[in-house]
Curated annotation (Swiss-Prot):
Family: Belongs to the purine nucleoside phosphorylase YfiH/LACC1 family.
Lineage: Bacteria, Bacillati, Actinomycetota, Actinomycetes, Mycobacteriales
Protein name per Swiss-Prot or TrEMBL: Purine nucleoside phosphorylase Cgl2154/cg2365
Binding sites annotated in the UniProt record for Zn(2+): H68, C107, H124
GO function terms (MF aspect): adenosine deaminase activity; copper ion binding; oxidoreductase activity; S-methyl-5-thioadenosine phosphorylase activity
Keywords attached to this entry: Copper, Hydrolase, Metal-binding, Oxidoreductase, Transferase, Zinc
Species for this entry: Corynebacterium glutamicum (strain ATCC 13032 / DSM 20300 / JCM 1318 / BCRC 11384 / CCUG 27702 / LMG 3730 / NBRC 12168 / NCIMB 10025 / NRRL B-2784 / 534)
C-alpha cells in the first residue's frame, strides 16, 4: 500500500471551488446548493459529478438544510429519500463510506475528524451559528461518541476574512462577546469580523491542537462563490468521510 496515496488516508477532506460544473450564470459553474434558485437539474448534475470525483455514490453524500442554528445532528445513514437532513448546521457520524457535506458562500466550513475513534463531523459555522457555539457543541457531540479533543483534526475552509467582512460595530461586539478573537478591522478601517480567528481561539481553548485553515477569502477570491460579493450566487462545499476499509 502506498502511504502517500491520498486514497489510503484514514480520513478524506475536500473543498470545492466554483469551477468544473454545468450551472449557468450567476451560479456558474459548480454550484452545489439546491436552495439558491439554480436549475435543479444542473445542481443534480454537479452533485453527481462531485460524488463521482470523490469515488462515492451520490446517495452516500449527505447534505444539510442549513438554518444558521447551533443544532448538531448525529446520523447513521443517509436519509432514505435522498433529501437533506432537516434543520441542522452540523452533522456527525461514525459510519464509514458516508460523506458529510457543508455548503457555504462566505460562512466557515469546518471539517472535524478523530480517526482513532472513527468520528467525523461537518459544520456550517456562519456568524450566528459560530456566535452560538455550533463548533463547540459539535466537538462535545463527537466526545460523546469517543473522540478526544487532543486527537481531533480541524480543517477550516475558505470564508469571508476579517479584512473584507464589514459589519456594524454593535454586531461585531456582540459576536466578540460570545466568540472572543473574532472582531477585526477591515482594509477600509471599519469594524469587521474574522470568524475563523474566533473559531481558532475557541478550538484551542477546548483542547483541539491540530487545526489547519484555507487562508483564502471568499469575498475577494473570484474562484469562489461569495454571497457578500455577488448576492445571488452558488455554493461551494466542504466534504469529509471515512473511507471503507479494504
Amino acid at each position: 500500500m502506498d502511504s502517500l496515496d491520498p486514497r489510503n488516508r484514514p480520513v478524506r477532506k475536500v473543498f470545492t471551488t466554483r469551477a468544473g460544473g454545468v450551472s449557468q450564470s450567476p451560479y456558474a459553474s459548480f454550484n452545489l446548493g439546491d436552495h439558491v434558485g439554480d436549475d435543479p437539474q444542473a445542481v443534480a448534475s454537479n452533485r453527481n459529478r462531485l460524488a463521482d470525483i470523490i469515488g462515492l455514490s451520490p446517495d452516500k453524500v449527505v447534505y444539510m438544510e442549513q438554518i444558521h442554528s447551533n443544532t448538531v445532528t448525529v446520523i447513521d445513514e443517509a436519509p432514505a429519500d435522498g433529501q437533506a437532513v432537516e434543520a441542522t448546521d452540523a452533522l456527525v457520524t461514525t459510519q464509514r463510506g458516508l460523506a458529510l457535506a457543508v455548503l457555504v458562500a462566505d460562512c466557515v466550513p469546518v471539517l472535524l475528524s478523530d480517526t482513532d475513534a472513527g468520528v467525523i463531523a461537518a459544520v456550517h459555522a456562519g456568524r450566528m451559528g459560530a456566535r452560538n457555539g455550533i463548533v463547540a457543541k459539535t466537538i462535545a457531540k463527537m466526545e460523546e461518541l469517543g473522540a478526544k479533543p487532543s486527537r481531533i483534526h480541524a480543517l477550516m475552509g475558505a470564508a469571508a476574512s476579517g479584512a473584507n467582512y464589514e459589519v456594524p460595530e454593535a454586531m461585531a461586539r456582540d459576536v466578540e462577546a460570545k466568540l472572543p478573537g473574532s472582531i477585526a478591522r477591515t482594509t477600509k478601517g471599519t469594524t469587521g469580523l474574522d470568524i475563523r480567528a474566533g473559531l481558532l481561539r475557541q478550538m484551542l481553548s477546548l483542547g483541539v491542537q491540530m487545526i489547519d485553515s484555507d487562508p483564502r477569502c471568499t469575498i475577494e477570491d473570484e474562484d469562489l462563490f461569495s454571497y457578500r460579493r455577488e448576492g445571488t450566487t452558488g455554493r461551494q462545499a466542504g466534504v469529509v468521510w471515512l473511507p471503507k476499509e479494504a
